[in-house]
Amino acid sequence: MKNYKFTISFVGTNYSGWQYQPNVPTIQNEVEEKLYYIVNKKKPIKQKIRAIGCSRTDKGVHAIEFVFNVKMEFDKDLNFLRKALNSALPKDIKIHNIEEVPLEFNSRFDALKKTYIYKLFFDEKNSPFFQDRAMLVYKPTDLGKMMEISHLFLGYKDFRGFTKELEDENGYCSVENITFKVDYPLVEISITANRFLRYMVRRMVGTMLSYAQGLISIDDVNDFLKAKRVSNHTAKAHGLYLKKVYY
């Protein structure tokens, strides 16, 4: 038995996230199904395939770099496996690299930090080109205000105010940096942290956006950051990309 690390990218538009769900298309469903067929072909005893993903992604979220690992027996060239998988998988999922790693490697728990990017497209003409690749923004927005409050999210803080609901679980995350890449009308916000809670990036971006549109005050933002209440200002899933996983 060996452990293999897979590095992939995908367009999440047609999938209900990474994690397996019965009767709905997910990235995990696709890679496990195709991998099972390839590694067990012409073998009398079939081995079970279980892919451990580096992160759960929501429906519609994309990945520039996503990592999963699989423990299995495989006696052929890994480049052959990569090519075979890419031939079998849908065109919106791409395998970039496969490598053998130590048996104890776990793509989820061994990740030191991750970088997500969020794409905003400030669109007054309803462009069709970014419909599923960025959040289209129609309301007047002060981009300077978004940048101005982004520093409030930096550091080691309790981010339960930016997740699904206030819970007793550990909500502390260390946000290392937040940067803006402006190529108007497209704006990319990059956020790096040691860990992320569910909806955290989307609600951080949605909160910054609402503040920049005058919908909420700085006091509201501070309340969310103190976990006094949960922000319901959630940016669309299809603007979010997992960019990099660090080990």
Swiss-Prot record:
Its EC number is 5.4.99.12. The active site is at residue 58. Gene3D superfamilies: Pseudouridine synthase I, catalytic domain, C-terminal subdomain (3.30.70.660), Pseudouridine synthase I, catalytic domain, N-terminal subdomain (3.30.70.580). SUPFAM superfamilies: Pseudouridine synthase. The keyword Transcription does not apply. Substrate binds at residue 116. The keyword Nucleotide-binding does not apply. It catalyses: uridine(38/39/40) in tRNA = pseudouridine(38/39/40) in tRNA. It is an enzyme of class 5 (isomerase). One of its GO terms (molecular function) is RNA binding. InterPro entries: PsdUridine_synth_cat_dom_sf, PsdUridine_synth_TruA, PsdUridine_synth_TruA_a/b_dom, PsdUridine_synth_TruA_C, TruA/RsuA/RluB/E/F_N. Keywords: Isomerase, tRNA processing. It comes from the Bacteria. GO terms for biological process: tRNA pseudouridine synthesis. Homodimer. Belongs to the tRNA pseudouridine synthase TruA family. Formation of pseudouridine at positions 38, 39 and 40 in the anticodon stem and loop of transfer RNAs. This is tRNA pseudouridine synthase A. The lineage of its organism: Bacteria, Pseudomonadati, Aquificota, Aquificia, Aquificales. The gene is truA.
